[in-house]
Regions:
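Extended catalytic cores of very large enzyme megasubunits
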Residues: 1-290
Length: 290
């Protein structure tokens, strides 16, 4: 294995404008290493039904897939799956798929599938609830489209839709109201969705501005920045199932009381007290402005 890794690195180092085809040499070497780890062979892949059962036994695939499809359905998938499409990857593309999207134990580094198994299982999972007289044609068409790079899939779907922790939505909008129960409930929802691999959009425009009256003037509002810091901490304390760090975009209307402070929240100048740099921001403009 160490010799194989040296060969992969050597081929990758030779990739250049003058010798671009080394990207395929490095990709083939990396693919052979992956296949040896996953199936212990270079050419003879297991039947997709056996592969699925094995991954379910290891706890990395959702068992419901075997309840949704019969053995004859898996036989059709086996006829459609084309492992030679793995050779279409460049080195950079295959490396990204292995590092980010293949189901694996990120503690031990053990990988449980190859790219074509990944693509077929994604397709089968997405159409599992479709009418039985139509879904297999959808499975094939979608598999062909994604395995031949005709369409792209968002990270939450590509990385985990076939696992026990499903996440079909790549992005989730959390609408925050101007009450403490809503703000704290939204914070919990943000944390759970980030842990489920979703990107987050936060509509925080209804949170009132700094020094606004609360309970008839008994309390003055602390403003949006303390709550944004809370959201920032929640987003960054979780990763998207080990694939990448959480991310969120916060939306504010342009007429918000604190808009002048909001638009500089990512500015390098300023202190940690008045900056929230690890979130992204969007300013909403209505038709009154154009």
């Amino acid at each position: 294995d160490e010799i194989q890794q040296i060969l992969i690195k050597s081929a990758a180092d030779l990739i250049s404008l003058e010798n671009p085809n080394y990207q395929y040499v490095a990709a083939r070497l990396l693919l052979y290493s992956l296949r040896k780890q996953v199936i212990d062979k270079l050419w003879d892949h297991p039947h997709i039904y056996e592969h699925t059962k094995k991954c379910i036994e290891k706890g990395v695939y959702d068992p419901s897939i075997l309840e949704s499809y019969e053995k004859k359905d898996f036989d059709r998938m086996e006829n459609w799956i084309n492992h030679n499409r793995d050779y279409d990857f460049t080195y950079a593309g295959l490396r990204q798929v292995i590092d980010k999207y293949l189901v694996q134990d990120r503690s031990s580094g053990e990988v449980f599938e190859t790219p074509q198994f990944m693509y077929m299982m994604i397709s089968a999972t997405l159409f599992a609830k479709y009418p039985k007289n139509k879904r297999m044609s959808y499975v094939k068409k979608y598999y062909d489209a994604i395995s031949q790079f005709k369409i792209n899939i968002p990270t939450p779907v590509m990385a985990g839709v076939r696992t026990p922790i499903k996440q079909y939505a790549s992005c989730v909008l959390v609408d925050v109201d101007d009450t403490l129960p809503s703000i704290f409930s939204s914070d919990m929802a943000i944390g759970r969705y980030v842990a489920q691999r979703a990107g987050i959009g936060i509509n925080a425009g209804r949170i009132r501005g700094i020094n606004s009256r609360i309970r008839g003037g008994e309390v003055q509002h602390t403003g949006v920045i303390p709550f944004l810091k809370k959201f920032e901490s929640t987003v960054k304390c979780c990763t998207q199932n080990g694939v990448r760090g959480g991310s969120a975009t916060v939306h504010f209307p342009i007429w918000h009381q604190e808009i002048e402070d909001i638009i500089v929240l990512k500015n390098n100048k300023g202190t940690e007290d008045n900056r929230v740099r690890k979130l992204d921001y969007s300013i909403q403009i209505s038709k009154l402005f154009y």
